[in-house]
A protein has these predicted regions:
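Structural marker of alpha-solenoid helical repeat scaffolds
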Residues: 479, 494-495, 510, 525-526, ...
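Amphipathic alpha-helical scaffolding segments comprising HEAT/armadillo-like alpha-solenoid repeats
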Residues: 448-459, 481-493, 511-522, 545-562
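Primarily the internal scaffold of c-type cytochrome electron-transfer domains
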Residues: 32, 36, 44-112, 118-123, ...
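Canonical positions in the second alpha-helix
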Residues: 564, 597-598, 631-632
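Structural detector for internal amphipathic alpha-helices that build alpha-solenoid repeat scaffolds
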Residues: 435-446, 467-480, 490, 498-512, ...
């Protein structure tokens, strides 16, 4: 039995005697019909979509889709040369594979259109990898997306590594109706999709029932498929509901972990399908500005725009993906003397004017986005803007060392200079008070004292965005005590699922009986992300005498967690979690296999290597411990932690 199945079987031994029926995998959803079918009626929308990034998110290689120079040219980076050429009508990339041998791979797919285009190669049947030398569409050149930081072979971030497996990490957001179909036993993929590229049905849902309605609307009294509307679609955007629209976009435009299979039916609530990353160090700056490749949703949730009901389509055409107006006009549709009656909280005022921005009209400094949407560059050349739409806070940047939009242009000046300038120009501004970023920065620096109280205060402040409050609770995890967990317990009933899930996680710090009592309501929470957070805390809890209703809720939540783990059996992170679970359940051999699978996928996971060494030592397998350490050092020869373990084993 593969160890992932063994582990989940052990997990469910906890529920012996409790009746639990796994959620059925039914065929009660409509079938996909393809974007070409949709275009038969929706011509204008289809025409706008044809030139969009969505339409070109994943394409078959061919003369009309491949823009890179495959004319036999070479590209050398850090001493390794890659050749791009064609043969027998195919496009090929010749490069060094993991064993160090040169090998030619046929291009199996094309990803993206601008500002760069990447190419997919099949390294084994059914498994696609994203090649890291990409085509720069602007300068018409090959370049490495990591620049001087290019990872070496055997690194998890190398183009052959698990974090670059298209099937696992990318395809669900570059295709319509994608099914990964990873077999943990054979470690093989048999992926399939309804359509490559992000087609109509990726957002609107499978169209079988809708086309039946379109053919005979008079005869279409009721959809034969549960969960579809009067026109046969699983999601209805016509009502203009913010949650419906924004959460549909957020499924891909966010840094998140899939709870389901990564391909939820459109209309599925975000927190039933995903767990959103909080404002963690390495992902976001302390003040919430984007840092790593976190996409849009996490920053948009911090914005006043989101808080006041703004939807993606207020600024972006949903079919072309382009802004609905040029330049500042996209902002002045609301931020102007006439304001916009759809958003009554707006202040009617002249913004697109030197009296507000203090720059020459027509210059970059006069553009709203220059001051309110700071830009970061990813993948070497891809500039993306922060969607928290924040008021510049150079005073905060001077304190925390966070980016300041003023200094993006005025590079010769300091943040303190910019703060002084803004104070002169806006002497009565209300935007210079305390900020959660100050608390987060102190917590990240492991400041002691009252920082726990400060984080709790942020978490309890209902006027802060939910993602900020949840992030405060997340920062409490390393310093949590039973007292802090008790203080946070009331937030398990918070209106925001991000806050509820984070408050549940903190209850790990309290005694088992008390913990169980607190998390019981969360096992039946409306959001799956909260239920799964509660299920994680059931291991070791006194569940033997649960009332039947409570036991069923616990079994359901645990089943959802089990399914979430199984859906990510090709992720190294999953096996780290699995190994930890096995240790809690006192199954050392299962734990070793889990940690070994994690390091097979990503040899740079030093902690997983160390756990293998420690467990083997604990069970008296010194030879196995020595062998695991040797393998760990081969992959990480300079790691000080592993070097220390070598000295310890040598004694």
């Amino acid at each position: 039995m593969p160890f992932i199945r063994c582990l989940t079987a052990l997990l469910f031994c906890v529920w012996s005697g409790i009746a639990f029926a796994e959620e059925k995998q039914t065929d009660d959803a409509p079938d996909y019909v393809g974007s070409a079918t949709c275009a038969g009626c929706h011509e204008a929308e289809a025409a706008a979509w044809q030139s969009s990034h969505h339409a070109k998110a994943w394409m078959e290689p061919g003369p009309d889709t491949v823009d890179g120079d495959f004319g036999g040219v070479t590209f050398t980076h850090k001493g390794k040369t890659t050749r791009f050429f064609t043969r027998d009508g195919g496009y090929y990339i010749e490069t060094t594979d993991v064993p160090g041998e040169r090998k030619a791979f046929r291009v199996a797919g094309v990803g993206g259109i601008t500002p760069l285009q990447q190419y997919l190669v099949e390294t084994e049947p059914g498994k696609l990898q994203t090649f890291d030398v990409a085509w720069d569409q602007i300068q018409k050149r090959w370049y490495h997306i990591y620049g001087d930081q290019a990872p070496p072979p055997h690194d998890g971030l190398h183009w052959t590594g698990p974090y670059k497996t298209w099937n696992a990490r990318c395809a669900e957001c570059h295709a319509t109706g994608f099914e990964k179909n990873y077999d943990a036993t054979t470690r093989k993929y048999s992926s399939r999709q309804a359509e490559i590229s992000v087609g109509c049905e990726a957002c609107h849902g499978p169209g079988e029932a809708h086309t039946a309605w379109a053919r005979e609307p008079e005869a279409y009294a009721k959809s034969p498929f549960p969960g579809t509307d009067r026109t046969g679609l699983p999601v209805d955007f016509s009502q203009g509901l913010q949650t419906t629209e924004v959460e549909q976009c957020a499924g891909c435009h966010s840094r998140r972990e899939a709870l389901l299979d990564g391909n939820p039916l459109p209309g599925t609530p975000f927190h039933d399908a995903y767990r959103l990353s909080p404002l963690r160090q390495g992902l976001y700056h302390a003040d919430g500005q984007i840092l790593d490749e976190v996409y849009v949703y996490g920053s948009f949730l911090q914005s006043k725009m989101f808080a006041n009901g703004v939807r993606c389509s207020n600024c972006h055409d949903p079919h072309s993906g382009q802004l609905i107006a040029e330049g500042n006009a996209v902002c002045t549709q609301c931020h102007s003397p006439s304001a916009n009656e759809a958003f009554p909280a707006l202040t009617a005022k002249l913004y697109d004017d030197p009296s507000h921005h203090f720059h020459e009209p027509g210059t970059p400094g006069a553009e709203c986005k220059s001051c309110h949407m700071i830009e970061r560059t990813y993948m070497g050349i891809d500039g993306r803007r922060d969607h928290s739409f924040r008021v510049p806070r150079p005073d905060l940047s001077a304190k925390l060392g966070t980016p300041d939009t003023c200094n993006e242009c005025h590079t010769e000046k300091s943040a303190s200079w910019a703060a002084d300038e803004l104070e002169k120009r806006f002497p009565n501004s209300s935007h210079r008070g305390s900020h959660f970023g100050e608390v987060f920065a102190a917590a990240r620096q492991n400041t002691t004292g009252a920082i726990g109280d400060d984080l709790l205060a942020v978490a309890k402040q209902g006027t802060f965005p939910g993602i900020v409050r949840a992030s405060a609770l997340d920062l409490l995890m390393p310093r949590a005590t039973p007292e802090i967990a008790s203080e946070a317990a009331a937030l398990i009933g918070d209106p925001d699922p991000l806050v509820r899930a984070a408050a549940v996680a903190l209850q790990q710090q309290v005694p088992p009986a008390e913990k169980l009592q607190r998390i019981v309501p969360a096992l039946s929470d409306p959001a799956q992300s909260v239920r799964v957070a509660a299920a994680r805390l059931l291991i070791g809890a006194p569940i033997a005498h649960m009332p039947d209703k409570m036991a069923k809720a616990a079994a359901r939540a645990s089943g959802e967690w089990q399914k979430s783990l199984q859906n990510k059996a090709d992720f190294p992170e999953t096996h780290l979690v699995s190994g930890g679970l096995a240790l809690v359940m006192r199954r050392p051999q299962v734990a070793v296999r889990a940690f070994a699978e994690a390091t097979r996928l990503d040899p740079q996971l030093v902690n997983a290597w160390v756990m293998q060494v420690r467990i083997r030592m604990a069970v008296g397998d010194m030879g196995g411990a020595q062998l695991a350490l040797q393998r760990a050092l081969l992959a990480n020869p300079d790691d000080p932690n592993l070097q220390a373990w070598r000295q310890q084993l040598a004694q």
